[in-house]
Amino acid sequence: MDSSKTKTSSSAAWRIGLGAGVAGAMLVALKYALRPPTRRRVPDAISPTAFATKVVPTGLGEVVYHEAGRGRPLIFIHNIGLGASSYEWARVYPAFADGWRVIAPDLVGFGESSRPNVAFEPPDYVQMLAEFIRAIECSEAPVIIASGLSAGLCVQLAVQHPALVARLILHMPNGTGDCGQHRLTWFSRFIYRLPLLARFLFRNHLSTRAAVAHWLRKAIFVDSALVTEEIIDVFATCAQQPGAEFAAVRWMGGGLRLDLDTALNAVARPVALTWGGEGAPDAEETSRRLQRLAAAASLTVFPSAGIMLAREAPEEMIAALREQLRDDLRVILKAG
């Protein structure tokens, strides 16, 4: 046999074997990287000890919520984002338990609630919120306090199910999914629409303690010195729960975007807006524009605050909410 042919054949076989070996190693590595993470216990700090933790089923999954107090129902809805949960409001909502029935749920896909492998859409969350409010058997329509993208979802809830909402108090609502200084660019939306890559990036980078801490300090909190170890622990643990990537990746891929302007223009319930002056580059312009869209909406601006006002300056948020919730507050319903 020709020795040159033998060498060529051996070289080709070696390359094929090497390629197969590399491909196999990559598949093993990818399989390892995409393993469901080990379930970690969510820190007790996620809710005050005086609040009972309860669970109700919805069509999207089980909703875990914290409740205390008696009176008119007052529901606090956390923003949608990395490691999000009802912990966002945990320094605020206890202040209202002496005169209200205070309820703080984790949205499905976040916190301690179910985290199904579902391609979430805004209508799914609107329906989930409607089912949740019906399931907790409110004596009357609740006042809803919400932030960010979740605030936008609550506006849609009020438009589609007006009997389930008495009033909306919205902190920096949006329909884009932008969170604080974190912007969802077209490139990030493209990357996070690739399921395997998105899950890989989320599990092995974005949900790590270091990445969560960086995100909180650089994008979410105006004063990074206020990002405590407890805050990092709760956000990182929630981000690392099995299945936490499904809703988060959907959010980062732009799958939860909604038309906030149209919804605000159609809402027939009283709306109050609170805004952080440091929360976004165009904060003042955006807040004024949204105020004009919602009939008779009030606007309270916190010049040195951002999207996480409820944790950075809870006393200021509590004071603003008390002002909005006064019994003698005059509200004007939109005609029709």
Each predicted region: which residue ranges?
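Flexible "cap/lid" loop of the alpha/beta hydrolase fold
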Residues: 159, 167-199
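A short loop-to-beta-strand scaffold at the N-terminal edge of the catalytic core in hydrolase folds
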Residues: 58-68
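Conserved HGGG/HGGXW glycine-rich cap/lid loop of the alpha/beta-hydrolase fold
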Residues: 67-112
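Conserved alpha/beta-hydrolase catalytic His-Asp/Glu region
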Residues: 179-181, 204-265
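Conserved loop-alpha-helix segment in the C-terminal half of the alpha/beta-hydrolase fold
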Residues: 266-305
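Catalytic active-site module of serine/aspartate enzymes centered on a nucleophile-bearing elbow/loop
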Residues: 295-336
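Active-site loop/oxyanion-hole signature of alpha/beta-hydrolase fold enzymes
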Residues: 90, 103-145, 310, 319
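Hydrophobic alpha-helical topogenic segments used for membrane insertion/localization
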Residues: 9-35
